Design a protein with these regions (language model features):
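Terminal peptide-recognition signature
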Residues: 23, 27, 42, 60, ...
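Conserved phosphate-binding and hydrolysis motifs of nucleotide-dependent enzymes
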Residues: 26, 32, 64, 70-72, ...
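Crotonase-fold acyl-CoA enzyme core
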Residues: 98-215
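Hydrophobic alpha-helical membrane-association signature
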Residues: 38-42, 89-92, 122, 196
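Glycine- (often His-adjacent) and acidic-residue-rich active-site loop
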Residues: 6, 54, 62-99, 115, ...
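Conserved CoA-thioester-binding segment of acyl-CoA-metabolizing enzymes
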Residues: 1-63, 98
Length: 220
């Protein structure tokens, strides 16, 4: 299998394998929290995908033990210094979500460890979600005086789990573990942590075996 790596980004790692981009959120020391640089780089990456016909599938994952812990509240000037800064950060992340949905490539989300707040929004914006058995997900924004509705969660979550369960997660802030996520329909499959990459590779291979135009039009 041929592959190539993209070293253009600081907070993202991209490996291209036979028609699939393996896009890794790469701030493991910060649990892949979303800072200003990651926001700008994700906007750039997903904004360019429409014209990258050599990329037919995207596999999104997090480096280290966690998928994404949400907004980096220590990122001065972007999040955490004031409510206006927090809201601006949320609006930029909402644009990432829109670009994820607009791109014609299906996105497979591989979720391990924590997927909270903005990280949970990234997971919801994926077309298919697989979870490791240690995955935990929640909507954390309301706990810090923000809304869980501005970055796509209030749109995608009720469609995945129903209105009552979505309201419970958005207003209660409770964590959902992998087994419950599977029962709720949040994820398609739960596997052991060491098998998560193989599960993603298997589905990516199935997608790549489809007609390129058929796959693209189905996502669109």
């Amino acid at each position: 299998m041929s592959s190539s790596a993209d070293t253009h980004y600081q907070t993202l790692s991209i490996e291209h394998k036979e028609g699939a981009d393996w896009l890794t959120l790469n701030r493991p020391d910060a649990f892949n929290a979303i800072d200003q640089i990651m926001t700008e780089e994700l906007l750039d990456y997903f904004g360019k995908l429409y014209f990258k016909h050599e990329v037919r599938v995207v596999v999104l994952r997090g480096a280290g033990k966690h998928f994404c812990s949400g907004l980096d509240l220590n990122d001065a000037g972007h999040f955490g210094t004031s409510n206006p800064a927090d809201m601006r950060g949320q609006r930029l992340i909402s644009e990432i979500i829109m670009r994820m949905r607009r791109c014609p490539q299906p996105i497979i989300g591989l979720i391990q460890g924590a997927a909270t707040g903005g990280g949970f929004a990234f997971a919801l914006a994926c077309d298919v979600r697989y979870a490791a058995d240690n995955a935990r997900m929640n909507v954390a924004m309301a706990k810090i005086g923000l809304t869980g509705c501005d970055i796509g969660i209030s749109y995608f979550l009720p469609r995945a789990v129903g209105a009552s369960s979505a309201a419970e997660m958005m207003m209660g802030g409770r964590f959902v573990n992998a087994k419950k996520a599977l029962r709720m329909g949040l994820v398609s499959e739960v596997v052991e942590s060491e098998d998560l990459e193989a599960a993603g590779q298997s589905l990516a291979s199935d997608m790549l075996a489809m007609s390129p135009m058929g796959l693209r039009m189905t996502k669109e």
